[in-house]
């Protein structure tokens, strides 16, 4: 799995950076949002990207080249953007099984048995985090 996984992430990084898609994403981020809502957009986008690139470091390599310049263009603090990225990455770990594989194997439990609880925790945390970014970040 790992032998295929990291070259796949490098391929995503290469496509984004060398095809011009990264520049298009920077302009898209700047055009669809404003400084007030940018952290929420980064939070949601990081969560979605986490489903494709579950490794936090690899995800940062793929995502940072366009979320950071877009933040700089809008004048949003990079501290807020990095927090939104990290929390977006971590929050969607609740609904993908990679983190739970060792625990599930140790206790001989299937992911479908804990998934409903993970969904409840994810939805609750998603709402609270979005409200935090919208109400208290500025």
What are these regions (language model features)?
Residues 3, 44, 48, 123, ...:
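Generic alpha-helical transmembrane segments of integral inner-membrane proteins
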Residues 4, 8, 83-87, 115-123:
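Internal alpha-helical transmembrane segments of multi-pass membrane proteins, especially GPCRs
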Residues 4-16, 30-69, 74:
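Hydrophobic alpha-helical transmembrane segments of multi-pass integral membrane proteins
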Residues 14-26, 52, 132-138:
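Transmembrane helix-loop junctions in multi-pass membrane proteins
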Residues 24-27, 57-70, 98-110:
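Re-entrant/interfacial helical elements at transmembrane boundaries that shape
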Residues 28-29, 33-37, 86-93:
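Structural signature of hydrophobic alpha-helical transmembrane segments
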Residues 92-138:
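Juxtamembrane and boundary regions of transmembrane helices in multi-pass small-molecule transporters
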